[in-house]
Amino acid sequence: MAIDALFVARGVSLGYGESPVLRDVDLEVREGQYWGWIGPNGSGKSTLLRGFLGLLRPLAGTLEVAPRLTDRARVGYVPQRSELSDALPTTVRELVELGLVRSAVPHSERAAALRWALERTGLTGMERRDVWSLSGGQRQRALVARALVRRPELLVLDEPTEGLDVATQDALLETLGALHREARLTLIVVTHRLEIARERADHVALFLDGRVIAGPRDVVLDSEAARNAFRGPGLALP
């Protein structure tokens, strides 16, 4: 395992019970990379993510995780759907502070970590706003801030643009791009939207029929398998 590798899958099959959802996966995520994991619903994106996060054991092959990432505090995760109840009156500050629970951030540095997370997500000055008074895009940025306040080495986002209008999607993706460039944060964006990977990521994992084609963006998207998969209205590759 290379010194800058965070996750390495070699010949991995993953699934539930004895039925594999993914077969013979080879994929390596390294520090500072921006990954787009693309595929339709049910293609295995979340299954592989669960494997990397230690929530699912492989049926075959080897799955290695950098020792420092076995401490969950080093991984920030933004789920596809917020688990918050709309009956819970939570301010932006209270929501973001939830990310500090069981984190490795020293108590003496938590105020600075909170300010940094709010600043990076464009939420400075909104700390006292009720989460449910925010727009969809602002609420999604608050969830990103909750993950960032832990000072993670890796940020994983599951369908972060789902349900947002185009302008709000673009603003959120610009925020993520700035985090990748300026904070050198490693990103994995799980999505079914081809354009996110094509325009934003530098590495792509394409989930097709139980297999994964993974590597540098242009190599993967120029492959015959990718071109066959994305033929059709609005999906054609350049």
Positions of PLM-derived features:
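H-loop (His-switch) and adjacent beta-strand-loop-beta switch element
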Residues: 204-216
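H-loop/switch region of ABC-family ATPase nucleotide-binding domains
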Residues: 191-192
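Helix-to-loop junction immediately C-terminal to a conserved catalytic motif
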Residues: 53
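Conserved ABC ATPase "signature" region
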Residues: 109-126
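Conserved ABC ATPase signature
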Residues: 130-134
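Conserved catalytic motifs of ABC-family nucleotide-binding domains
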Residues: 151
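Catalytic Walker B motif of ABC-type/P-loop ATPase nucleotide-binding domains
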Residues: 155-158
